């Protein structure tokens, strides 16, 4: 055999064994991260911060973790700034980009002064409890801020329990994968010492129109003073983002195993403490949160001084 023929055979051998793996790696996995509410829709209101700010901060941190550690994943955000986006457009963004996964990030609330706390992850379905229905009603009420919402959502009334009957008859072919991701998310939250309130189902419009595995995450209760304080700090937001990233890694590895792909996900995330570039969305958001904390601190100090003088 000539030297030239020998090299040719070796080349074919290498292509036969390694090209399939390379081709599998070339398939980009797309995840859409949806920061709930925004712009004229503040979401749930806390004492010192609105839901929309927490959602955006955690969404950007989660996206950055994936971008820094998962080379075969494309991250798309429904919003990276404080702006209002219609619920159906959030789903459309995922569908247009042929996303493999949709994660909508929210913050829960009940009546002020409540001690209810903990994380929940929802998949699409009929709410089996009054509590789940109330959460869905709260999140779906964002459509009331949209133009022509009655036409856009075919007469759906977010405040009417009758409107939610349609979800009982909806069959979602991605339900199994959605529940799998939701379960991993709740496990990760439990591992970082958050109260695990479980995987639940409810009729969320933003999940109804997506054509891929989808979940809606409630990070905690902004109506609970301790949880609000945790969620408004950079350290708390980092922990929540890292828990979501950990769950994403496990889901993605299972996905790659089923598809026969080579996973490009790194399990241990790079620290999310880096300083964002000046003028970036994350930098502007950090400055707003710092200003709010300083204002609150000054207000508390003034109040204490007044009380001391009055004694």
What are these regions (language model features)?
Residues 1-9:
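Bacterial N-terminal signal peptides that target proteins for export
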Residues 152-161, 216:
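Flexible hinge/switch segments at interdomain interfaces of large molecular machines
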Residues 43, 162-265:
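Active-site-adjacent mobile loop/cap segments within catalytic or ligand-binding domains
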Residues 162, 289-294:
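Polar/charged, compositionally biased leader and regulatory segments
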Residues 9-18:
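Bacterial N-terminal signal peptides
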Residues 24-156, 171-175, 179-183, 238, ...:
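Catalytic-core regions of hydrolytic enzymes
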